[in-house]
Amino acid sequence: MGRAFEYRRAAKEKRWDKMSKLFPKLGKLITIAAKEGGADPEMNAKLRTAITNAKAQNMPKDNIDAAIKRALGKDGVVITEVNYEAKGPHGVLLFIECATDNPTRTVANVKSYINKIGGQLLQNGSLEFMFSHKAVFEFPKSHLHMDREELELVLIDAGLEELDEQEETLYVYGDYTQFGSLSSTLEELKIDVTKASLQRIANTPVEFSEEQLADIEKLIDRIEDDDDVQAVFTNIA
C-alpha cells in the first residue's frame, strides 16, 4: 500500500485494543519461523525478529515459548502460510497474507468477506506484478546513535534501498531477499529496532476519496479481525 495510508493505519492501530487478536497472530509467525529455521533465536534471524516484534507488543514469555514448542510438533498443529488476492470496493486491490492450520476454512472466510461487499477473489498471481516485496524495519529516531548519512552508507552495503522518516520514526526499506542482511547489520550497529516485517508495497498507488477510504477500511478491519489473517496490503496511495 502507499506510504501515507500505511502510516495512517499504523497510527490508528496503536489506538485500538487488539491484544486479544494480536497475540495469536504473533504466535503463528513465531511458530512458522521456528519450524523453518530451528528453535534457537541466535541461529535463526527470522525467529529472532518474530520474537522481537512480539516482545515489542508486550507478548508474555510463556506465549512466546508455547509458540516455539508448537513448531517442534508437540501439539500436532501444522501452520501453513497462504496468500489471497482480491479486488474490493471502488476497485481497490488487496493482497492478503494468512497463517492457518486449516486453509479450507481460511479461504472460505476471506471469500465471504470479499463477496459481501461485491468484491472478487482473484486467481493467485494476478497481483504479483502490482506490488514490490520489501523488508521494512522501524525504529525511533532517538535510537540512532550515529549520523543519518553515515547510517545510510553502512546500510547500502547491506541492501538498503530507501531510508524514510515520519514523525520521529525512521523506516529502512530494502528488497525482501535482503531481510537477513539488513537485520544483522542493524543489530551490529546496536540499533534497537521496534518492528521488522516483510511488506508488499504498491508499485502504482491510487488515490481514493475519504468516503471511498471509509468503505475500504471497513473491509480491511473485517479481514484483519480474522485470526488467520496476518496482514492486508493495498494499492492505496
From Swiss-Prot:
GO terms for molecular function: DNA binding. One of its GO terms (cellular component) is cytosol. Its main location: cytoplasm. Keywords: Cytoplasm, DNA-binding, Transcription, Transcription regulation. InterPro entries: Integrase-like_N, TACO1_YebC-like_2nd/3rd_dom, TACO1_YebC_N, Transcrip_reg_TACO1-like, Transcrip_reg_TACO1-like_dom3, YebC-like. GO terms for biological process: regulation of DNA-templated transcription. It is found in: Cytoplasm. Belongs to the TACO1 family. PANTHER family: TRANSCRIPTIONAL REGULATORY PROTEIN YEBC-RELATED, TRANSLATIONAL ACTIVATOR OF CYTOCHROME C OXIDASE 1. This is Probable transcriptional regulatory protein WS1016.
